Every structure is written in C-alpha cells, then in structure tokens.
C-alpha cells in the first residue's frame, strides 16, 4: 500500500490556513494530521473542521508544534517570519518537509533557515502558484533582452489585511528583473516615491503597493520605453491556487535530499 504523507497546517485559523485545511482534506494524495495555532487562541482544543464552521475532521487544533510535527511528513506554513523561523527548527528536528509561503522575511531571516535546511527539505517561495512562477521566468528573460532604455516597474495589489509591502511576489519579480539585467536588486530598487523626487534614475526597478478590499493578488511588471510599453501580468482570483501549489511542493519534497529549494525546483522551470 502506498504511504500517504501526513500534513500539518500552521496558522490554521487564518484565511490561507483555512484554505490549506480544505485543500488537504479534499485531496486523496495526503492526509491532515495536525492544525496549529498560537497559544491562547480560542480554537485550541477544538476540531479544526468544526472551528471552521464545517464537519468534524478528527484533528484538534493544538499549540504544540513539536507534538504535531512528530506525526507528519510535511508542514505547510503561511504565518509570520518569527513564527516560521521557530517552525523551521522544529520541522528539521522531526525531519518534515517544510513548505514556507510566509512573506515579509528579511535577508537575515532567510539566511537563518539554512541550519534547518542542512537536516530537512525546505521549499520556500514568495508565491506558490504555477502562473506566478512562470511570470518570474518571463520577467527574467524580458529584462535580459531589453536595455536600460526600458524602465522597469513592479506594481502589486492585495487585500487590505496584508501587513507587508512590497509583497513577496513583487520582490520575486524584482529579483528576476535584476538578475536578467545582471545587477543586484538592493542596488537598484526604488520602493518609495513621495514629494519632489527628481527624475527617475536610469536602471532603477520601482515598486508600488496597492491595498484595498478583498483583492487576492495582482502583479504587473511594466517595461516602459519612449514610444512603447510591455506589461506582464498575473491575477489570482482564488487563494486555492496558492494552496494547490503548496501541496504540490509538500509532495515533491518527499524523499528529496535536505536543502533549501523553491518553486522553480518543484515545477521544473
């Protein structure tokens, strides 16, 4: 009989957490074995399905990650940077595949994942969808093909609850554009324009963040030159695309050598 991997969902009460719970329980390729929330949360001890307003799933929400991870083969984590760092160490201890969709992580926090990646598989991406990861590759190719006569701007829009800006996906796109041009994003990123800023610096990559309503996620990469413009665009209308990508990553990571991977590896792009 084929072994069916057990999955733990962190931040189970959140919008993404609930979508992940539904996606895992709807799949015949994995099984839900754990649902985590922070200590003191009113879901602790309740069946996660009932807490979500549905049928019982036989999995009680817990605030003990090590106990939950001990039963699992993978952890899917869309939480916050500090929480993700703690989960990474515990997931590595349990030898679980750790799928990280958490955004807003600093370079130092990303580097802090490396000790865990020496012992377990980490798959981390600012966006888990196939479409966005294709957009990243296209952005890199277009940036490499065009010279600095084409200004590059990354514009993203999300719901009004999102706490970080630019989005992780916008930064992925900016990194791809910078890589295509053979420069470091930190050297050319322009994240703040307000007031009398002067003319645009040639070669900069600009970022713009829109927050409003219930926008799931929209990303545009604009290449603008005198007389012509190219726009690469991705629109997500349902969080399920991120959940499906995360589940694909969790399955892909089974049996892989320890290391720090991304969705390009998972999708073979």
Curated annotation (Swiss-Prot):
CDD domains: DHDPR_N (cd02274). It holds the Pfam family DapB_N. One of its GO terms (cellular component) is cytosol. One of its GO terms (molecular function) is NADP binding. Its EC number is 1.17.1.8. It is an enzyme of class 1 (oxidoreductase). Keywords: Amino-acid biosynthesis, Cytoplasm, Diaminopimelate biosynthesis, Lysine biosynthesis, NAD, NADP, Oxidoreductase. Coiled coil: none annotated. NADP(+) binds at residue 38. It is found in: Cytoplasm. It comes from the Bacteria. Pathway: Amino-acid biosynthesis; L-lysine biosynthesis via DAP pathway; (S)-tetrahydrodipicolinate from L-aspartate: step 4/4. GO terms for biological process: diaminopimelate biosynthetic process; lysine biosynthetic process via diaminopimelate. InterPro entries: DapB_C, DapB_N, DapB_N_CS, DHDPR_bac, NAD(P)-bd_dom_sf. It catalyses: (S)-2,3,4,5-tetrahydrodipicolinate + NAD(+) + H2O = (2S,4S)-4-hydroxy-2,3,4,5-tetrahydrodipicolinate + NADH + H(+); (S)-2,3,4,5-tetrahydrodipicolinate + NADP(+) + H2O = (2S,4S)-4-hydroxy-2,3,4,5-tetrahydrodipicolinate + NADPH + H(+). Catalyzes the conversion of 4-hydroxy-tetrahydrodipicolinate (HTPA) to tetrahydrodipicolinate. Belongs to the DapB family. This is 4-hydroxy-tetrahydrodipicolinate reductase.
